[in-house]
Swiss-Prot record:
Localization (cell): Nucleus; Chromosome
Protein name (record): Histone H1.11R
One MF annotation (Gene Ontology) recorded for this entry: nucleosomal DNA binding
Coiled coil: none
Alphabetical keyword list: Chromosome, DNA-binding, Nucleus
Biased composition (Basic residues): 121-135, 143-160, 168-183, 192-219
Organism in which the protein naturally occurs: Gallus gallus (Chicken)
Amino acid sequence: MAETAPAAAPAAAPAPAAKAAAKKPKKAAGGAKARKPAGPSVTELITKAVSASKERKGLSLAALKKALAAGGYDVEKNNSRIKLGLKSLVSKGTLVQTKGTGASGSFRLSKKPGEGLEKAPKKKASAAKPKKAAAKKPAAAAKKPKKAVAVKKSPKKAKKPAASATKKSVKSPKKAAKPKKAVAAKSPAKAKAVKPKAAKPKAAKPKAAKAKKAAAKKK
């Protein structure tokens, strides 16, 4: 029993060592936070230097480095950061490259950094307007069939004049038949008027008889 007790004590020793190892990363993380440089970033310094320049054609890379060095920035150590910062600002649209390619050349600020953001919503609003117009077009298209129904009704109206025309055509023979009756009625009257004219010579015969009687008396 006395021999096993000392063996248990070394086994319990690794547990405090593990706790100490777990605490060390926290201290390392705190050291990393302390290493971060306090103050503005490279991009902020570049934008301030470019905005401070009054050159119309833009600020060259050499002039930019001079301005950053005058502000206390270590240009030689952070040369690669300056180039990366310039490229990122050009890609975002905050800076415009007037000369050269890549990080070399001249740079100037865009007219208004917020213009790009303001124009985007306007484009979205203009894109939304055609949708509303497209929504109105189907409604107009739905109304058009009603006009087509009105056009279908119009042939019915056209049929009515055709029916009236047939009625008139039926009535017209009756009117044409009436003058025939009138002509037939007038012709007997003319015939009657002719007969009395023929009867006048018959009336002259008695006068001749009277003349013969008067002559006989004279004898």
